Structures are given as C-alpha cells and as structure tokens.
A protein has these predicted regions:
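Tandem CBS (Bateman) regulatory domains
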Residues: 1-10, 49-87, 99-103, 119, ...
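The conserved cystathionine-beta-synthase
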Residues: 14-32, 37-38, 88-106, 113, ...
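A glycine-centered beta-loop-beta connector
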Residues: 27, 35-52, 102, 110-126
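Glycine-centered flexibility motif
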Residues: 59, 108-109
Length: 142
C-alpha cells in the first residue's frame, strides 16, 4: 500500500510569518494537532504542533488573567517556534516506510511533499493505526 492511498490530501497550512495567535486559532478551529507552515513560495518550511504552541504560551492566554506579556507572546511569528528540517515522505512511498519513519524518529506525523518540497499531504500515526486495524479485522473475518 502506498502513502497516497491513506494520506490526508486536504491540507490546512499557514504562512511561517503568521502570528502565533493565527496558528492557535487555526489549530483550534480545525481541531487539528499538526499545522504545516509554508514560505513565500508555498514550499514546506516547518511545522507547529498543538503541543509546541502550548509550551510557548502562558496558560492564562484567553482568560481574564491574561497579561500584556501573554498578548505580546501571541504576536510572535510562527517561524520563531516552528520545527524545521522536517522528516518527510513522498506519496509513492510504501506505507512500511511511513511506519518506520514514525517509529524510528519518535514523531507523530509526516508531511508528504512533492519533488519541489511542496506539501501535498500529511499522514499521522492515527492514519497508520486505522489502516492496520482494518487489515487486522479483515483477517479475522476470513
């Protein structure tokens, strides 16, 4: 099975120059855990996870106790906290490669890029687990 058969193709991306407030809003409004960031040419530049974001924000953000410092933190640019030098895969790669990359690198998702490093999909450990569970259930029925 190829990655392209199970990857999420409808990507939600954000400019790496967007403020953290926009990254937070995007992660929350789409209920996603991984946000791919692009450069001015639309190429994959990095990623912010919900965990990365909350590590950099005060727990008082969005509450009545929010301070000026909290507000200033939200204006930082996404590229200031994004993960760079991402491990990626290509759509034609086998699913087995995805499993090994996720496991061996202790990561929870893989951006899928084309030959020009443009993000064309994303695959998470949950996507892989879903496929494996379906295959297991099929075997049980036979």
């Amino acid at each position: 099975m190829k990655i392209e058969n199970i990857m999420t193709k409808k990507l939600i991306t954000l400019s790496m120059d967007a403020p953290l407030s926009k990254a937070k809003e995007t992660l929350e409004s789409y209920a996603i855990h991984h946000l791919l960031l692009t450069d001015d040419d639309g190429l994959l530049a990095g990623m912010i996870t919900d965990r990365d974001l909350y590590k950099h924000l005060s727990p008082t953000v969005g509450t009545s106790q929010e301070s000026h410092r909290d507000t200033a933190q939200l204006q930082k640019k996404s590229h200031q906290i994004m993960a760079r030098n991402l491990i990626t895969a290509q759509a034609h790669d086998p699913l087995s490669k995805t499993i090994l990359l996720l496991h061996d690198n202790h990561i929870s998702c893989l951006p899928i890029v084309d030959k020009d490093n443009k993000a064309i999909g994303i695959i998470t450990w949950r996507d892989v687990l879903k496929v494996l569970a379906l295959q297991y259930r099929k075997k049980q029925k036979t």
